[in-house]
Amino acid sequence: MTAGAKKLSLGVLLALGFIDLGRGGFHWLAPDSGAGVVAGMNLSFPNARDVVFLLALNGISQIFWGIAYLFIVFRARQLVRLALLMEVVRGSMVLATEYLLKPPVSPVPGRFMHMATTIVCGGVLLLCMLPSGKQHR
């Protein structure tokens, strides 16, 4: 991995760590988990609390992804490529679900973030796979 790719990959994971902490904290702590306020979902139906609950659970998961990414950046840099690969796979699965398998009725507020994160992490992962030039042939 080149020095530039290493810095870029650490920067991307650092940013994703803080984004996931913020986004996850919001979903977990907001009274409606962001369903009504951010996504504009109708929460007047009887099982609306289930939607709020599921978004809060997703927020908890995002918090732990954020912690994991920050741990990798500061303590376990040997896992950077694995973290980027996992983010690309996760993002691809989210996009496949969102656009092909189970499209939602209303637009997902984070849909462009899903695309951008998947593309950026995929590009950085490819850069990380390039040889550093220090290898002997």
Regions found by a protein language model. Name each.
Residues 38-42, 104-116:
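Non-cytosolic membrane-interface motifs at loop->transmembrane helix junctions
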Residues 17-36:
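Transmembrane alpha-helix/helix-exit interface in multi-pass inner-membrane proteins
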Residues 66-82:
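Juxtamembrane helix-break-helix junctions at the cytosolic face
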Residues 1-23:
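Cytosolic juxtamembrane helix and N-cap/initiation of the first transmembrane helix
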Residues 119-137:
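Membrane-water interface at the C-terminal end of transmembrane alpha helices
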Residues 82-99:
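Hydrophobic alpha-helical membrane segments
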Residues 40, 44-70:
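Core segments of alpha-helical transmembrane spans in multipass integral membrane proteins
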